[in-house]
Amino acid sequence: IRAKGNRLAELRDTLLGTLKPGFRELYPVRFPWLNSTQETAVNKVLCARDVSIVHGPPGTGKTTTLVEAIYETLHREPQVMVCAQSNTAVDWICEKLVDRGVPVLRIGNPTRVNDKMLSFTYERRFENHPAYPELWGIRKSIREMGGRMRRGSYEEREGMRSRMSRLRDRATELEIQINADLFDSARVIASTLVSSNHRLLNGRRFPTLFIDEAAQAL
């Protein structure tokens, strides 16, 4: 990663071990439903300024610890991003958060999302938005006018072009509105690491990123 004198450079050097990670001094939070090791790990995550790594043998509750850290972080931050190497891992975390009432927006191919999380995918939420029927109607009108333009006179075609231009502008406004509503209402944006490069996430910034199965991505 070619970066110098910025936050990306700091994170790169921290992950490579050439820069010591920073931690805040916070009063420990108690989690009676976790064991002492898990509780310590969650608090370490909450204190991290740069990066915190939770590691351990299989079956020790690392993902459970991660879910708790995410939930607690949402008491401090308006929105976080959650990623994992596999769709199964992303869905498992999302299910646990949804069960706690956390609004989740799942980014990725809906055909690879489990049935329980399907209603939380971007595509399904987009189609269920109150403004979607108007957008669908506009798109239908544009398609129909496109078909009629080939048969109309010059004056009719010019009139339809003008109307289609206005409809396209309105469609763009609705798409922007729906996207803003979906992202603004979600507390957790979730995707696989591959899908985190999705165009919908271009330009978006998150105070904290959680990655499950991080070692599998190396």
PLM segments and residue spans:
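Pre-ATPase regulatory/linker segments immediately N-terminal to the P-loop/RecA-like helicase/translocase core
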Residues: 1-43, 99, 117-140, 144
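Phosphate-binding P-loop
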Residues: 33-34, 42-51, 73-76
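Short, conserved phosphate/pyrophosphate- and ester-handling motifs at nucleotide-, phospho-/glycolipid
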Residues: 38, 58, 62, 86
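Acidic, Ser/Thr-rich intrinsically disordered and amphipathic helical segments
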Residues: 40-41, 53, 65, 92
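Walker A/P-loop
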Residues: 49-69
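Catalytic P-loop NTPase motifs of RecA-like helicase/translocase cores
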Residues: 61, 217-218
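Alpha-helical nucleic-acid-binding subdomain
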Residues: 67-208, 218
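Walker B catalytic acidic pair
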Residues: 213-214
